[in-house]
Amino acid sequence: MSEVDETAFEPLLSEEAQKGLRGPLRPGDYYLFGSDACVEGAILAGCRYYAGYPITPASEIMEKAAQRLPQVGGRFIQMEDEISSACSLIGASWAGSKPMTATSGPGFSLMMEAVSFAIMSETPFLIVNVQRPGPGQGYITSSQEDVMQARWGHHGGGSLIALAPSSVQEMFDFTIQAFNYAEEWRVPVILLADETVAHMREKLTVPPRDQIKVINRIKPQDLGIPLEKYLPYEPYEGKVPPMPAWGDGYRVNVVGLVHHPDGNVTKYSPEMHLACVSRIYQKIEDHADEISQIEGLFLEGCKNLVVAYGTTTRSAVEAVQELRSKGKKDLGFLRLKTLWPFPDHKIRSMVGQLENVFFPEMNLGYMIHPLRETLRDRAKNFISIPCLGQLHSPDQIIEKIKETIGK
């Protein structure tokens, strides 16, 4: 590990440094909390606006954003609740910013109406959900219980994107990727973290700036569209409509109602409704192979498969490696980096016929359902390995596998 650049933390060390602006982290190696890595990734992605309300275990992201955003010329605001926080992101996005917030289960529930509005109005922003157990207030430890809510919690149709990081490095990398997805597809993106990865401290490597891919939304002026011919919800042969900011001179309709390409909401018809909602749904689902990310280990000749996502990946990989070292050479591993859109085609392209599929999740077994639908003709048995309130140990996973396929 190279030496940490201490000047990156000057604002913590002197009042003089705190008076000036300081840019994003310089390239190099750092030793950071997952929450801090998330904020630093957001800054490098171009985020300059954070609105939020504190909730354990997501408050550290808010605290770091409150410290760091003013240092890079950004804005931080603590809102009165999670409802206003999410709604504030909509306004900030249309003002031309790349906005974000962070919350946990109870707060995430309160944000669902704004998420639905953002899907319909095609407003890009990032919500980091540092998941905690539920229902209700549940507890403040680790969980993966909001994975279905991320996709289906908003009302109505439409689709969105959700990623699941497993390390401090991925809290940084996936935050940048999440902003890129939001900007490219004009959609809210959910980063499904959890208490474990948010509060762990690990090495973070910040690559050189020219190696960090940052995508910005396409504006109508980029395409040479005249002011008088601009239609707010017309893709113009692209994947999504170009998005101006307020003040750019274009007529902007921020519409939560079903609408025509020009933003008109008064000439309703079932045909118009179908066309509108189908487009905002299909722009994500029809490009699932382009958006989704998975990775596999030991898949050649695999007859028994362990699938995981998020921090559960860490225990699952260790369990697979331990069993393979003891002779279980037909045991493979598949990791879902993207949960939504669900990577069904990619999964089918990577695995063959299977005897057993094991799926450890920090919930009662949620993502095993779309996986079963995807591999219903490829696998005989689907075995959920649930755990609530804490990360699985590798031994828990090993025990279930041995119980099923023998010692």
Regions from the language model: what does each represent?
Residues 313-350:
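Generic long, charged, amphipathic alpha-helical segments
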Residues 10, 355-357, 361-407:
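Peripheral docking tails and interdomain loops at the edges
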Residues 141-195, 218-222:
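Conserved thiamine diphosphate
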Residues 4-12, 189-295:
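Conformationally flexible catalytic loops at phosphate/diphosphate-handling active centers
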Residues 66-71, 279-283, 318-333, 376-378:
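Short helix-loop-beta junction
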Residues 33-37, 284-304, 317:
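Glycine-/acidic-rich phosphate or pyrophosphate-binding loops and their flanking alpha/beta elements
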Residues 2-152, 159, 176, 379, ...:
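Thiamine diphosphate
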